[in-house]
């Protein structure tokens, strides 16, 4: 009996639109067979409800990421004398700038080197997250995961340890340094050749603390917003470190015609589909 293919839909929500891709894995390749986008016109709970009703799944489930205010921090800890609630209680004000209880937290643990432990913490603005969850509940849609911005970008890439991702934001370049799917450093720097080069060198020094000698690749978004000179400077920096490649992908049908690979939200949706298919950490 032929085993049925697992199908999953990754969704990315920004302030401008919602995009999604539907995919399955075949011959060690993620095959994207459908894609859809919808312009935002209402609060996130109303828009996600409208989107899910418009894009009713025949099979599979959703995994979702939304551009909600998110802060991340990684800190060492001693597992032999450790209580998660106490750790957060006494350190949260040092790690995050949210006021009071207006955020929701999640955390995971990593080890490097042996017997040296790190706690990766994510804080997300609570109100928008609760609106998103309410919109999902209203549809009774099958949702496996709600992930945190911009972590899913890593899931669409071949290298997720030692990769730097960046987004042009209001005249600055926002950079994230990734190790084992967690962000170990982020920074915002002016978009000049000197500043970005120095910033990446500092990220590389931080990366070496986690056993990776050099940057493994760079992926930048929003370069079309820059002047020609700025863009050429950024492209020159990418050429030094190399551009991080995608996981093996094949686009068919509406997936080929509609999905704009290389745009941040589409790549996020691809990453969420990969996570939903558990097509991460399989040697890529």
Predicted regions and their residues:
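Glycine-rich phosphate-binding loops at beta-strand->alpha-helix junctions
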Residues: 215-243
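Internal amphipathic helical hairpin motif
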Residues: 68-119
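Phosphate-interacting basic helix/loop segments used at nucleotide- and nucleic-acid interfaces
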Residues: 45-54, 148, 159-160
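Glycine-rich phosphate-binding/hydrolytic loop that grips phosphoryl groups
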Residues: 245-284
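Small-residue (GG/TT-enriched) beta-loop-alpha framework at ligand/catalytic clefts
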Residues: 2-3, 7-22, 31-37, 58, ...
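Nucleic-acid-processing active sites and adjacent nucleic-acid-binding tracks
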Residues: 27-52, 191-193
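Well-ordered, non-membrane alpha-helical segments in soluble/globular domains
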Residues: 44-49, 85-88, 196-205
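Short glycine-rich phosphate-binding loop at a beta-alpha junction
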Residues: 56-70, 212-226
């Amino acid at each position: 009996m032929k085993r049925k293919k697992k199908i999953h839909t990754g969704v990315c929500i920004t302030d401008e639109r919602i995009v999604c891709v539907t995919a399955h894995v075949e011959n060690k390749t993620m095959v994207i067979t459908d894609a859809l986008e919808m312009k935002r016109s209402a609060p996130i709970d109303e828009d996600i409800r409208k989107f899910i009703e418009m894009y009713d799944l025949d099979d599979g489930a959703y995994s979702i990421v939304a551009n909600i205010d998110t802060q991340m921090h990684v800190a060492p800890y001693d597992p032999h004398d450790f209580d998660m609630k106490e750790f957060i209680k006494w350190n949260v004000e040092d790690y995050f700038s949210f006021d009071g209880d207006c955020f929701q937290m999640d955390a995971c643990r990593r080890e490097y080197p042996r017997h040296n432990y790190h706690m990766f913490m994510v804080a997300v603005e609570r109100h928008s997250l609760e609106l998103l969850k309410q919109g999902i509940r209203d549809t009774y849609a099958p949702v496996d995961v709600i992930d945190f911005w911009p972590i899913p970008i890593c899931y669409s890439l071949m290298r997720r340890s030692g990769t730097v991702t960046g987004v042009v934001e209001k005249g600055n370049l926002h950079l994230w340094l990734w190790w084992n799917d967690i962000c170990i450093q982020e920074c915002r720097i002016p978009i000049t050749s000197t500043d970005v080069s120095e910033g990446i060198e500092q990220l590389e020094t931080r990366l070496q603390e986690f056993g990776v000698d050099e940057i493994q690749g760079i992926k930048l978004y929003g370069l079309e917003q820059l002047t020609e000179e700025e863009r050429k400077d950024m492209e020159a920096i990418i050429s030094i470190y190399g551009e991080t490649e995608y996981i093996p992908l094949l686009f068919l049908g509406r997936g080929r015609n509609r999905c704009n690979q290389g745009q941040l939200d589409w790549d996020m949706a691809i990453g969420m589909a990969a996570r939903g298919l558990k097509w991460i950490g399989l040697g890529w």
